[in-house]
Amino acid sequence: MSDITLGIIGGGQLGSLLSVAANKLNIDTVIFSDDKNSPAKNFTKHFISGNYDDEKLIKEFLSKVNVITYEFENIPYKILKKLNEIKPVLPKPEINKLIQNRYTEKDFLNKNNIRTTRYSLIKDEDDIKINDGLIPGLLKTCTLGYDGKGQFKIDKKENISSEIDFTKEYILEKFIKLKKEISVIITRFGHQRYEIYEPIENLHEDQILKYSKIPAQISEKIKNQATDWATIIAEELDYVGTLCVEYFIDNKENLYANEIAPRVHNSGHLTINSHNVSQFENHIRAVCGLEKVETKKIYNARMLNLIGNDIKDFRVKNFKDNEFFFDYQKTEIREKRKMGHFTIIEKEN
């Protein structure tokens, strides 16, 4: 085994897949999760369960690892900062703090001349009425919320849901005429040192990623712009590791940055089978200071997210040589819960 032991905060499927990639590189992992039933415990030799602010567990975690990363962005900044004072946390905690808030994230993008949909900070119901130029639009909590949680469609300023809790801050984003969604995954190893995956075309159902494919059916102009913006973002953040930028394309072929995920990303699961180096392996290589390997696409690919009961048929299915199924080994099947993914690879024409 390597002399490096990687600490991973978070025990979901991304933690599992990071641990699998680390093992491939002979790197031990220690997964720290606040859920004792986290599926990632099945993919590591060392699993710590408890509250992230538990001093005893933090001390145990730090004693076992050389470097720390995380599989989701909603970890309190103060915890990442505290860990980083003793062992390096990558990506840097300050990046996570910036991106945890949708308003500061959008401001960062706009300050770097990266187009987003029009938006405004919303603190109360009157702010929505004042910003009626953003209606119809989508109201999102500034912090927390993923896969459509904490979001409300606003079609008229008179029709504001009573479910909206105005003790929280929100961001109101104007709807565009959406044609397509894509994502770009990039791994930054240091100043101007990158591995970039080609844009991935995505389809969402109920605001949860359902389907991804490469190559994306997009123009060369959009492809280059999306890749350039992802590079600017990674460089401006002084990022280390794998990052994903999600984009919208409207019916006039305008590109908009939707959000930044400071971690490996669901749409990149297909890279496990389509490329010589997956997004997970590249992340491990970057945060652990390993050699950068030129990343090449070997196959075109399609990936299906298995949500809820979708998993049942796949657990008993026989697969062809070009089909790959990954079961996240979650004990409970729930509606809208990501249970696994299925990838088909195809040779380029």
Regions found by a protein language model. Give the residues of each.
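ATP-binding N-terminal substructure of ATP-dependent carboxylate-amine bond-forming enzymes
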Residues: M1-Q100, T104
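Active-site "cap" helix and flanking loop/linker of ATP-utilizing ligase/carboxylase catalytic domains
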Residues: N224-V245, N251, A261-N309
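Short acidic-glycine loop/turn motifs at beta-strand connectors
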Residues: R188-R193, D250-E253, I307, E346-E348
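Protein kinase-like catalytic core scaffold
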Residues: E195, L243, L255-E259
